Amino acid sequence: MRRRLPAFLTLASIALAGVGLVGCSSEGASPSECSPVDIAAVREALPDSLAKAKLDPHSTDEDEHSFSVLYRAQDKEQVSLLGTKYEAEGSPVCPDDPNEAAQRYLELLHDDLDAQNADQQRPANEYSPFEFTAADRRFYCSAWPVEESVSTTCVTTVGDVALNYYLHRDGRDSAAEQQRMEDIGAELAPALQDLD
């Protein structure tokens, strides 16, 4: 089964431009201003495995502006990873501040999740933010309780691409889930180092 990118990924790109967190066009920009990258290059740079989870080649969904992949492990752990171009009015743009853009992107993910909860008459999530650095790359993350387990997501910026990953397992210890997300980020960061 092919995974479809959630609609909020495109919304997040447009909203970032609307609040002024993205600034330079990907055409003719100097390396000091922004580093546009090919979305396919980001996808191809991903490792074949993340700890025990192996990349599922049948899970990939990709177009010129976005992609999604899924890593699966035998113990039912899954990591879904989504990449999407920052855009403004249909054109690729790079963040003026990649860290601020990643933080804002995370806020927009929260907004989207809370809107989904509201549509289903459920309360808003109680997010616990955390952040970390791996191989000089900053990751902005959140953990929140869902029934008896803990959900987590992290965002980083690679050139003009927002890279977002989720951990899917029945983890109940927030500290353990946070550590697992940091371990995943530590594996991803070196693979992305030469892209931006």
Q: Where are each of the predicted segments found?
A:
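C-terminal motif of bacterial Sec signal peptides marking the signal peptidase cleavage site
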Residues: 19-23
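Bacterial N-terminal signal peptides that target proteins for export
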Residues: 1-12
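A small/polar (G/S/T-enriched), proline-flanked helix-loop surface module common
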Residues: 28-196
